[in-house]
Every structure is written in structure tokens, then in C-alpha cells.
Amino acid sequence: MRLTLQHITRLKVLLHLAGFLPLLWLILSVDQGWFSADPAKDIQHFTGRMALKLLLATLLVTPLARYGKQPLLIRCRRLLGLWCFFWATLHLVSYALLELGLDHLALLGKELISRPYLTLGVISWLILLALAVTSPQIMMRKLGSQWQKLHNFVYLVAILAPIHYLWSVKTLSPQPILYALAALILLLFRYKKFRQWWR
């Protein structure tokens, strides 16, 4: 069955709910004390995993649209990318406020040097920031051919973000490995484009 614009509109509503409802759960979990004895870590991990899931979902759209012969699915990609940026921003803010605290934000630079996995995370966030700012149609028209070159940097985020996660947990636990494998598989779908981008 070929998806119609009406189907895509309904799908977008569901995707918005998928991006928003976990935020309500997070707020409720904090309010009700459902997290472990280290809620700051739990919040950081939850927001980080949400950002990573949405990044993978964003990368999944193109293969689904191409191989599933559903070109209208591409219209969902920007929505997922913006939700990914939203959760990545929550992840960064939760680290800055809960780990460092308002009184110690000046230590962030020192933290980035002493903990390289943080550097990877911040680089990923800066790329996502650039992609979010330039995602509207008006920016696409202004940037012209440079727009696609800029947005190809999402592939770099797909490499850096799983490494950031693996490195931050400091153990070879299954979950970050699965995220890394999923990112690798999605990048393999773009092997030719990815190779051209690095030339």
C-alpha cells in the first residue's frame, strides 16, 4: 500500500507523541522518585538514549522510503531530527546542571579535556544544532547545494554519538553495543554516499 499525505499527517502526529510522551514520563519519574539512588545519572542516560533512538529513527527514514517505495516518508525525517536535537539538548543540559551544577559550569572546559567522551558528545550536539537551525525550507533555499553537504554531517554524528555512549558507560554492556551496531547497519545503507562525502 502506498502511503498518502493523509497517512503521513497521521504518522507525524504519532511521531510527535513518541517524542513528547517520554518527557512526561521523565517528569513524572523525577516527581515520584522512580529513579535509582543516583537520579542524576538516570536522567542523563535516559535523555541520551532518547536522543540516540531518535537519531537512528531519522537515519532509518531514507532506507524505508527507498526500499519500501514510500517516498512520502521523507517528510517525517525533519520532524524526527528536530526531536533528536531536543533530546540531545536535554541530555547536555542535564549533565551541565546535575553533574556540574550552576556554580561549576566554568569547569565544563576542563571536563571536556579530561573526559574525551564528553568532547565527542559536545561535537555531536554542535552538529545537531547546525542541522536544526538550517532545517527549514527557507534555509535550504538560501544554502543551495551547500545545504546537503552540511546535512551529511549527520553521518558523523551517527559515528560519534554511539562511541560517546560506549565510552561514557565504561563497560561493554549490551545496550550501547546494540546502538552502535544499529548505527553501523544504517550507515552501510549509505556506503556509496558516505564514501563520496569523505573524499
Curated annotation (Swiss-Prot):
InterPro entries attached to this UniProt entry: Fe3_Rdtase_TM_dom (IPR013130), MsrQ-like (IPR022837)
GO annotation, cellular component aspect: plasma membrane
Topology with respect to the bilayer: Multi-pass membrane protein
Name of the protein: Protein-methionine-sulfoxide reductase heme-binding subunit MsrQ
Function: Part of the MsrPQ system that repairs oxidized periplasmic proteins containing methionine sulfoxide residues (Met-O), using respiratory chain electrons. Thus protects these proteins from oxidative-stress damage caused by reactive species of oxygen and chlorine generated by the host defense mechanisms. MsrPQ is essential for the maintenance of envelope integrity under bleach stress, rescuing a wide series of structurally unrelated periplasmic proteins from methionine oxidation.
Cofactor(s) essential for the protein: FMN; heme b
Pfam families: Ferric_reduct
Chain ranges passing through the membrane: 13-33, 79-99, 120-140, 147-167, 169-189
Main location: membrane
High-level lineage: Bacteria, Pseudomonadati, Pseudomonadota, Gammaproteobacteria, Enterobacterales
